[in-house]
Amino acid sequence: MHFSIPETESRSGDSGGSAYVAYNIHVNGVLHCRVRYSQLLGLHEQLRKEYGANVLPAFPPKKLFSLTPAEVEQRREQLEKYMQAVRQDPLLGSSETFNSFLRRAQQETQQVPTEEVSLEVLLSNGQKVLVNVLTSDQTEDVLEAVAAKLDLPDDLIGYFSLFLVREKEDGAFSFVRKLQEFELPYVSVTSLRSQEYKIVLRKSYWDSAYDDDVMENRVGLNLLYAQTVADIERGWILVTKEQHRQLKSLQEKVSKKEFLRLAQTLRHYGYLRFDACVADFPEKDCPVVVSAGNSELSLQLRLPGQQLREGSFRVTRMRCWRVTSSVPLPSGGTSSPGRGRGEVRLELAFEYLMSKDRLQWVTITSPQAIMMSICLQSMVDELMVKKSGGSIRKMLRRRVGGTLRRSDSQQAVKSPPLLESPDASRESMVKLSSKLSAVSLRGIGTPGTDASASDVHGNFAFEGIGDEDL
């Protein structure tokens, strides 16, 4: 998550009280809450009481007199660095003190009273699930409510997450972010004041080996099946004509497990796909489509001649990555305290091991750069958990009474319709041996071509380089 305080506001106190400066905290470039310095000071003091002063980053000191505009701007910058440092700290950023502060501030900023409401959550295939929640319910509360409505067992809830998406005109989803523990889903989606924004339930892991755990349960199997069919229909999962024929045959037989077993062998199974954006690889200002999954970032690009190519960047070859944001100055070239900034430009840059002794920075410019970064981090976290022999089954925080609320009226996951005929522009993949800048770019076929699964090859540009070389 990218925390920033890009602007301040001068506001009047309640009931005609004295004016004060409000600091607008943004998450991923969107306003999350509006707080006073005194509120952040109270948070700091509470964290210091719980964790000790040595753990906390520096907090801007109190001032005896009113601040000048320059001092307000200086404090804004200091508070922004403080919030970023706290969020990035594994102990402080995951603490209930920090997260509950942000939830309360979000609810107060949007002036949403605590009451019971119906919240619509979509499955990957577009099926609607209506759950009764409180406006003050946090993300885990809502996730549990959806699981209860679908009759998904408690021990499988941790395999799924809620995502905030924007629904496009063609019905496809553009992923905004994974909903976090510091926000209230009802407030997050309604505060955007647009019917385009939805909440979607989707599996939250990358390694398809974990599918086995989920497929043991009927509801889990249906959720994976519905998501996979939807991803194939959207073109997120790449299939040949023959593979498509086999999948449709398994659909007709209602062989869901066999369908998923075959789908697991397909390119981009379980990937998240992002909107078209721009990268500086293999050349500057190159239009690309980025997908994340299977411990890699995949970049698809169309070269002269309309041939579609794909380059893969493994997370185990990334030395580090960073997200940077830049904001154009208002007309006139100068910025002043309290003035709003322009649209934020986001970039994800990662340093990649191109050859045994050569690292190169690759930059992707996209409004979804932070979501890409979160995907990278979660892939690394999952690899570390697997390496240590751990499990992604997480212990759930229990509600009062120690049990999960189960809905009186449960809802089944609808079986999706049969697959439609594949789009000729993406019906196959073919092997290409050409390489650009030491990263192999695989061809993804042209209309009328076909290939078997054995013709699909991974990125072997780094053969002979071990992970220990990083």
From Swiss-Prot:
User: Per its UniProt record, what SMART domains does this chain match?
Assistant: PX
Q: Which domain of life is it from?
A: Eukaryota
| Ras-associating domain span | 115-206
Q: Which InterPro entries match?
A: PH-like_dom_sf, PX_dom, PX_dom_sf, RA_dom, SNX17-31_FERM_F1, SNX17-31_FERM_F2, SNX17/31_FERM, SNX17_FERM-like_dom
PX domain sequence ranges? 1-109
Q: Where in the cell is it found?
A: Cytoplasm; Early endosome; Cytoplasmic vesicle membrane
Q: What is known of its domains?
A: The PX domain mediates specific binding to phosphatidylinositol 3-phosphate (PtdIns(P3)). Required for association with endosomes. The PTB-like F3 module within the FERM-like domain mediates cargo recognition via their NPxY sequences, while the F1 module (Ras-associating) is responsible for interaction with membrane-bound HRAS.
Oligomeric and partner information: Monomer. Interacts with APP (via cytoplasmic YXNPXY motif). Interacts with KIF1B. Interacts with the C-termini of P-selectin, PTC, LDLR, VLDLR, LRP1 and LRP8. Interacts with KRIT1 (via N-terminus). Interacts with HRAS. Interacts with ITGB1 and ITGB5 (via NPxY motif). Interacts with CCDC22 and CCDC93; the interaction associates SNX17 with the CCC complex. Interacts (via C-terminus) with VPS26C and VPS35L; the interactions are direct and associate SNX17 with the retriever complex.
Q: Which PANTHER family match?
A: SORTING NEXIN 17 AND 27, SORTING NEXIN-17
Q: What is this protein called?
A: Sorting nexin-17
